[in-house]
Amino acid sequence: MEPTSVIGTKNKKGQVFTDPRIMMREAPRTPSFYTGSEVIKEAIRRASIDVMIAYPITPQSEAAALIGELFAEGYIGDYFRGESEFAVMSQCAGAAFGGARVFTTTAGPGTMRAMENFPMWAGARLPIQCIVTCRGINSPLSIQPDTIEISYLMQTGMLVWHAETAQDFYDWILMGYMVSEEPEVHLPLALCCDGFFVTHTKDVVDLTPTDMCLPPYDPYRSPVPCMDMECPPVRMMRDPFIMKSNYISYATHASWQQEVWAAAERSRKHTIAWLNGLIETEDVDADVLIVTSGTAVSQGREAIRLLADEGIRVGLVKIKTLRPWPEEEIKEATKHATHIIVPEFNVIGWMAKEIKATIPRSERVIAGPRVCGGMTMPPEIIVAEIKR
């Protein structure tokens, strides 16, 4: 059934299946004061989710519990708890193989434990959405924000977006399904935020009407057939390619891995349309630019305000999506800059490395300041880096 055929009809909760463009662009919005976790719940209330699978790990546990309330209220089709993060992501794959719209959440060590499944999701072309509320993963453990796990996710074949605010989070959850479920894309989405900074602080978020929801997922638009889970048509693990011919194995895997990354590239035009671009810029003619993603953008904004009070002009480039990577946009935005400051919430500086690999005259990139393990980033240290 085409999604357009249900537009205007109602689900069992009385919500109207609404054209996503009307719902997100034209429908009236209500300002609401919510934590990021509550915002996740409100987005899922309107997302026509078939299956949510949960396993608790801070800072996403609250969101997973709140979505359980939505199941009790009848807003999502099914909800159950996994035995571990690895089990959750495997079960998500099973539900998506069966043609369900699937949602889950994880963070930090949970992301690491689940990691094997993410390339499998991408390779199987499963448009699952996973919220990643980034936190420390090193020993000694920390439950505080750290974005190192994003660097791993960027190599899985998934789409990877990085939200700055709760408003980003709300809009991008709903828009994310519209991009990832496009037949020429059909890839999983890791929608990341900086844990606690976004999940546990309150902010004003403009919400779409509660009586509107996304049209349901249509698995028949998938570029690969959904699987009959009662009578699967193939034996998934017996007689693998390599048992028959190394050449067949190489050809199969090489071509399909290239197709997965090509699908991520094909998401670019859809993502640009929904997110109003892969980057957001302010005053890019300035000699000094702050270029980063997530809540480091928010700290950069405050640093820019402090510097403006001293008569120092600094521009900003907010990177919204990491996969697809906005290569041409970053080159264009930074072409006039003499110094490019890249503040990050991780120890390895993966964002600075990506930017250095993207732009000409990479010596302009100043990798830092960086904080890690859950430390805050006072805007004053960005100011000090720029003055230095």
For each feature predicted by the language model, list its residue ranges.
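N-terminal glycine-rich anion-binding loops that anchor highly charged ligand groups
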Residues: 32-69
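Thiamine diphosphate
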Residues: 58-149, 154, 158-182
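Glycine-/acidic-rich phosphate or pyrophosphate-binding loops and their flanking alpha/beta elements
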Residues: 35-40, 265-288, 301, 305
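Generic long, charged, amphipathic alpha-helical segments
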Residues: 300-333
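Conformationally flexible catalytic loops at phosphate/diphosphate-handling active centers
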Residues: 8, 188-280
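Structural signature of the thiamine diphosphate
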Residues: 160-224, 339, 345, 381-388
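Peripheral docking tails and interdomain loops at the edges
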Residues: 13-14, 343-388
